[in-house]
C-alpha cells in the first residue's frame, strides 16, 4: 500500500509504502496537546518505508518524560506529521494523509486512562489504560 501525505501548507510532503503494522487511536495527554484535544489517530509503519519527498521536517523530543519519542512537524505551519519512537518504526498521523479514508478505522485504543469525556472509542475494539507490551 503506497500512501502519500503532507502538512497543511504544503511545504512538507511524504510517501510511505507498505502495510500498516497497527492502526490505532491514542488518548494520552501528550497526544491531546498535539491534536488540540482529540485522540490521535495513527498508523504504525515500518520505519524504512517512510521518506520525505518535499521539505525538511523539524524535530522535537521531550527530555523530561520516560520513554520519549521524536515528533516531526512542518517548520512553516506546525502540522505534526509523524513520530519516531526508538524502536525503528514510523508513526504516521492519519490527518496528514492525502486520502485519510485509506486508514479505515482503528483496531485498538491506548492510554484510555487519559481519555476525555468527549473522546469516542469505537465499540468492539480492545482498549488499554496504557500501551500494551
Language model segments and positions:
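A short Gly-Trp-Pro
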Residues: 1-6, 11-133
Amino acid at each position: 500500500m503506497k500512501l502519500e501525505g503532507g502538512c497543511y501548507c504544503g511545504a512538507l510532503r511524504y510517501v510511505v509504502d507498505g502495510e500498516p503494522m497497527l492502526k490505532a487511536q491514542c488518548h494520552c495527554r501528550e497526544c491531546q496537546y498535539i491534536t488540540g484535544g482529540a485522540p490521535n489517530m495513527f498508523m504504525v509503519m515500518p520505519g524504512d518505508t517512510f521518506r520525505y519527498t518535499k521539505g525538511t521536517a523539524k524535530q522535537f523530543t521531550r527530555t523530561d518524560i520516560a520513554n520519549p519519542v521524536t515528533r516531526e512537524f512542518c517548520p512553516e505551519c506546525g502540522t505534526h506529521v509523524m513520530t519516531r519512537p526508538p524502536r525503528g518504526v514510523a508513526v504516521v498521523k492519519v490527518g496528514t494523509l492525502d486520502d485519510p479514508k485509506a486508514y479505515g478505522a482503528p483496531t485498538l485504543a491506548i492510554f484510555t486512562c487519559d481519555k476525555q469525556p468527549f473522546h469516542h472509542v469505537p465499540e468492539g475494539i480492545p482498549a488499554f489504560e496504557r500501551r500494551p507490551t
